[in-house]
Amino acid sequence: MTFDPPLVAATLVRRYKRFLFDAVLEDGSDITGFCANTGSMRGLTTPGSRIYLSQSDRPGRKYRYGFELIEADGTLVGVNTSLPNRLAHEAIRAGLVSDLLHYPQIRTEQRYGENSRIDLLLSGSGKADCYVEVKNVHFIRETGLAEFPDSVTTRGAKHLTEMAKLVAAGKRAAMLYVIQRQDCDALAICADLDPVYGRAFTAAISQGVEAYAVKCAITPRGIIPACGVPVRLTV
């Protein structure tokens, strides 16, 4: 995916109230914008960091600028959690997850389970439909190892439980972790920050839920799913 219009560079002042951030544009203008990320963004909110912003003059939009990328640990990291579903779709279509090939139809936001929606539903291959839950990843604390989650995610544990129920009902279910950075070679579950998620992941895998991860190449011009990386299944 490409950013259109192009992103603008700025310096981060602070991120606050979960959805807001203050920054200084390169022309010295002070701005407040919207941060489409409800997570902790652990390690990605350091004041003074170089960031990249989308901009929109769409009528009814409260904030013109949106927080898209930040420079951290010598690499660009995507922070917009509204993008991973689209990136997952692109990754599957590009054949980056070999076990999810040969599904001609990909539908989004399909209802399943107890008042839940699946991010992607793969179908039409003559095989069992595959329910794909997409998660955004951008947390790294050990060189080369991306981790999820970066904070407690009650909804995430619930999703794993419901995915396991799908498998028990004879369906196929997979987690797809989209890593919005390129400086990693594997993904692990961060059970020390969220033990409940760690246990739910272990249980889901033991019951037949599949797990895959894709890392992305990121520039101020766009984000491209680059390749699959292994998921450590032992928590």
UniProtKB/Swiss-Prot annotation:
Q: Name one Pfam family in it.
A: SfsA
Q: Which domain of life is it from?
A: Bacteria
TM segment ranges: none
Coiled-coil annotated residue ranges, if any? none
One term of GO molecular function: DNA binding
**Which PANTHER family does the UniProt record give?**
SUGAR FERMENTATION STIMULATION PROTEIN A (PTHR30545:SF2)
Sequence similarity: Belongs to the SfsA family.
Q: What is this protein called?
A: Sugar fermentation stimulation protein homolog
Gene name in the database record:
sfsA
